[in-house]
Amino acid sequence: MIKTNDFMEIMKGRRSIRNYDPAVKISKEEMTEILEEATTAPSSVNAQPWRFLVIDSPEGKEKLAPLASFNQTQVTTSSAVIAVFADMNNADYLEEIYSKAVELGYMPQEVKDRQIAALTAHFEKLPAQVNRETILIDGGLVSMQLMLTARAHGYDTNPIGGYDKENIAETFGLDKERYVPVMLLSIGKAADEGYASYRLPIDTIAEWK
């Protein structure tokens, strides 16, 4: 359920929260809603390569704990930790995505046919490393949107990059060659307010030509 639609409050009130109220659980229905809203994020050629592993059971968290040894508080107290992956087989879903766009009236059939033909040729010769770099960017976009969506629902998050990326896919039965780790996101009800942080001024980080 949406708690606020005030975008500035959502964005500027976001904090990286490490300690959560362990009594607060997020239902599968609400988590599904949060993920659906987050996946309105943009992606290259609308391939939507993001994949989510929602780790919310005691057994799942027990598996995750040794892979995130420096982030134990987030793992143990959060409602869930979402492992965000990027799918190297992203091109496999283009037919489904573009066909559904035609069915829903978002795209004419002739545009879909032309796009699929061009994209099929593109992906056949696309170097794996270039595809990997692209889907990681897409994974970052959806992760940021997920954090903001969580805030709209009244929850807080913490993006985690310090974990065992080499072994997380296989630990949870996923193909490590196919699923590229993007980040972990803890989510739940903050037990602490978190800290405000300084941002560099625009004069330092931007220039006009």
UniProtKB/Swiss-Prot annotation:
A Pfam family: Nitroreductase
Binding-site residues, FMN: R14, R15, S16, Q72, T73, Q74, G161, G162, R199
EC class of the enzyme, as a word: oxidoreductase
One annotated GO molecular function: oxidoreductase activity
NAD recorded as keyword: yes
Native species: Bacillus subtilis (strain 168)
Intrachain disulfide bonds: none
InterPro entries: Nitroreductase, Nitroreductase-like
Protein name, UniProt field: Putative NAD(P)H nitroreductase YdgI
Required cofactor names: FMN
Protein family: Belongs to the nitroreductase family.
EC number of the protein: 1.-.-.-
Sorted UniProt keywords: Flavoprotein, FMN, NAD, NADP, Oxidoreductase
